[in-house]
Amino acid sequence: MVMMLFKKLSDVSEAEMQKLLSRGSGLEDVAKTVSTVLSDVRTKGDSALREYTAKFDKVELANFGVSEEEFQQALSGISPELLDHLKSAAANIRAFHEAQLPKATWFMELKPGIVLGQKATPLESVGAYAPGGRASYPSTVLMTVIPARVAGVEQVIVCTPPRPDGSVHPLTLAAAKVAGADKVFKLGGVQAIGSMAYGTETVPKVDKIVGPGNVFVTAAKMQIRDVAEIDFPAGPSEVLIIADESADAVMVASDILAQSEHDPNSVSILVTGSDTLAEAVKREVLVQAEQAARSSIIKSSLENAAILIADSLEQCIGFSNKFAPEHLEIMVADPDFVLDRIKNAGSIFIGNYSPVPVGDYASGTNHVLPTSGYARVYSGLNINHFIKYSSIQRISKSGLESLKETVIALAEEEGLQAHADAIRTRFGYKPSK
């Protein structure tokens, strides 16, 4: 029996609301285990990688790196049609992220003699994590590697868990080739994150680590931020759907199941002002769950699901902004009314024909998104995650003279006499006298 919360939003208890809003938490529960693995990887390098790969992935590897021969075998084993689909998705992803590219350098003249600007510089190295385990995710390789390449990152590596036979799924390797990854390593979980953060005999240290993962991967990313930058916490997947009576119950239910089949910890929520739609979606979810190929995972995930009936569309929007979903679907008669009022969402899908899976694979937007409410403060993966910005100032003597009194006054007020003197020396002052 599938048990999901079905209630009027106004009747949801404080405990039930807290459970909904705190989904994806539990980092503290795995913190000690994660810390131990990271420490071992940092001190023991490749030997720790072998130990934990054998322990967690149940496979013993002599070499972590994927060879060119393995790449060629993977490519030869994929049908031309599937490879074309992969390239088509890659082209859309590349085009969308190219549109985000900033000017390499720009300048403005603030006042005569005062020229200010900004220089955009790509990071030197990035590590992309692509999950494995229950399924392979070549799409995540495209989503992480392509933006890094478009941004101009010099070195991009990929870590992904090995299969039981020690190989990597052929389509994942094909995606790495299509996207332009420099190297792929057969490493998963905490040990993969540690290897990219600290570097080992085999795996190079990177400046930044991006990509989604389970609670262990997310906890590892949070713990290594003192040695490598990360994109954001990206844990179990989630969708929130705002729908009214104009929505199709079968479509809404199928979108709930699409999210639920990711992981038993995935979260799917429908919030609607229509009792009729809510009841219809509930019935349809139960029917589709029984027929689904990944029925057991879906049924487990639906324990985290909810169908909430709101008093108004405004109440739906208010709950959505509080929930800050990874994916937000808007399936209402006036979607622009809702869109204009959305403050917190990782990626937004408007209308009956913009389901989350199209963004997962082929529309071109990025599917690496903040989860667990982090959409309140983080953006989904984009070009700016791979670029840093340096401010520039080019000031003439006359320009500095126009700022002189202001700088001196503020510096002296803060008790920084040498700051003030650094200005005065440019106008004849000799601090040594």
Curated annotation (Swiss-Prot):
GO cellular component: cytoplasm
Gene Ontology BP term (one): L-histidine biosynthetic process
Binding site for substrate: 237, 259, 262, 327, 360, 414, 419
Stretch forming the signal peptide: none
Gene3D superfamilies xref list: 1.20.5.1300, Nitrogenase molybdenum iron protein domain (3.40.50.1980)
Pfam families, per the entry: Histidinol_dh
Residues binding NAD(+): 129, 191, 214
Domain of life where this protein originates: Archaea
Alphabetical UniProt keywords: Amino-acid biosynthesis, Histidine biosynthesis, Metal-binding, NAD, Oxidoreductase, Zinc
EC number(s) per entry: 1.1.1.23
Active site per UniProt: 326-327
Pathway the protein contributes to: Amino-acid biosynthesis; L-histidine biosynthesis; L-histidine from 5-phospho-alpha-D-ribose 1-diphosphate: step 9/9
Alphabetized InterPro entries for the sequence: Ald_DH/histidinol_DH, Histidinol_DH_CS, Histidinol_DH_monofunct, Hstdl_DH
Single GO MF annotation: histidinol dehydrogenase activity
Cofactor names: Zn(2+)
Cofactor: how bound: Binds 1 zinc ion per subunit.
Coiled coil: none
UniProt keyword Oxidoreductase present: yes
Disulfide bonds: none
Reactions mediated catalytically: L-histidinol + 2 NAD(+) + H2O = L-histidine + 2 NADH + 3 H(+)
Binding residues for Zn(2+): 259, 262, 360, 419
Function noted in UniProt: Catalyzes the sequential NAD-dependent oxidations of L-histidinol to L-histidinaldehyde and then to L-histidine.
Assigned protein family: Belongs to the histidinol dehydrogenase family.
UniProt name for this protein: Histidinol dehydrogenase
Organism whose genome encodes this protein: Methanosarcina barkeri (strain Fusaro / DSM 804)
Gene: hisD
